[in-house]
Amino acid sequence: MRWNGGKSAVLILALALALPCSASADPARELDSTEGATSRITPGRAADMAQPIDLSIDSAQSRNYLLPALQIGAFQFLLNRFDNLFLGDDFAVSLRSIRRNLHSGWTTDNDSFVVNQIGHPYQGSIYYGLARSNGLPFWQSFGYAFAGSAVWEIAGETTRPSKNDQITTSIGGSFLGESLFRMSHLLLERGGGLAPAWRELGAAAISPPLGLNRYLGVAGAKAFESGQPATFVRYQAGASTTLNSNLGPSLERGDNEAALEFNLDYGLPGKNGYQYRRPFDYFSFQVRTANRSVESLTNRGLLVGSAYSAGERYRGIWGIYGSFDYLAPQVFRLSSTALSLGSTGQWRISPSLAMQGHASAGIGYTAMGTVRSSVPRDDRYGLAPQMLLALRMVLGNDASLDLVARKYLAGNLIRSSSDATDRVFRGEASITMRVKRNHLVSLKYITSRRDSTLFGPGAPTQRRDTIGVYYTYQPSDGFGIVGW
């Protein structure tokens, strides 16, 4: 599959921005706000539930195992014919090419980074979504995505099957597909003030497989009970300028950029009665576009875990998280599909001060490379440890401070025959202040750094630091704080 960076930015952001949902909490547990600079925290109000769409079909009775296989096969046939018509001989599949791929070893392909790390996961999300919207649960849908990816590698292209594509398409695609599937249902359930027809259209934009199967009347496309999770949504639009830039071997240069950003936290811990029984009952999704391309996309969900508490003021969840990260801050690029052990929690320090946070560490199949490199293409693949720490401090209903730190440590695990090492750090710090009701303003600092010995001893650090001002819209009060 071929993928254009600008088109991917427009598509993914459009899917995200089609979700006009608001934070959900128990309105009976809300705290009254007070006048002054340090008003009490008000948990987000319950979302609009007017004119609900029927989602009550029992999922176990509505599962269809044959139809998703047929739909995935039809999708692959149409995609192959399109690619062969417009992109050339790599898709001129024949019985001879299929037989050759069946008997050849799996390799690492050399498609563009955006194709491999954005296009293939999105293609995998289509496979996954077709199974999921036929009523199948997470792990069974993952099996369809894995099988669909293998079939494409062998019979969808004439090139040798690629192990990096198999991983990002099936695993990264399933993580992405589940988040999009739940976003679509969130819109269908809550509506955001939209009429049912517009909700159906928006849900189809977010998850095309779900939209298709709802249009076809497939029973499994209506069979999902969310449990009414607590959510937090934030939209941002603004501009940033470069404070510090060290290109290293990159030929890319861009001092200023316009950016759009969408954030969704789903299933935040603390809501009474909400349970974490299924993969991605909690997830965090963020996409940022800058200058018409995807600058970052991070998607993290709880695969297996449980809730816990500590006293009256702290609620949390812990377990194994699955994640897909994509970073492309102009000078270098990174992608990781990972499993991590971690925890997400909320601490109500006082009536006017609260803290939310996440910490995790794990290992991922990681790709690293340089944007418009002055040296021969340096994209590298392999396993790499990674860590994540995120913190949000909330001051009443007036302001929040967000801090995020990501670290990727790629050394000999990347390539056992090489002593080269790669170290990537991504840090974000932002303060958001309420101007009026749902309208806010944010000041955000982002630093992206890569230390690599791949280019020889003493090679310079690739680094880009930016600061920007953003208009911010939050559909609800409370900055995502959950009441209990």
Residue ranges and their predicted role:
Residues W152-P161, T242-N246, V287-V294, S323-V331, ...:
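Sequence/structural signature of outer-membrane beta-barrel proteins
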Residues P20-I118, Q123-G124, R132-N134, F138, ...:
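N-terminal targeting leaders of membrane proteins
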Residues P137-T158, S170-S174:
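Small-polar-interrupted transmembrane alpha-helices in polytopic inner-membrane proteins
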Residues A9-P20:
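Bacterial N-terminal signal peptides
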Residues G172, G254-F262, E295-G301, R333-L341, ...:
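Residues that define the transmembrane beta-barrel architecture of outer-membrane proteins
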Residues L130, E261-D265, L303-A307, S340-Q346, ...:
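Outer-membrane beta-barrel architecture
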Residues Q123-G124, G156-H185:
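Alpha-helical transmembrane segments that form the membrane-embedded catalytic/substrate-binding core
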Residues M433-V435, Q462-W484:
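Outer-membrane beta-barrel "beta-signal"
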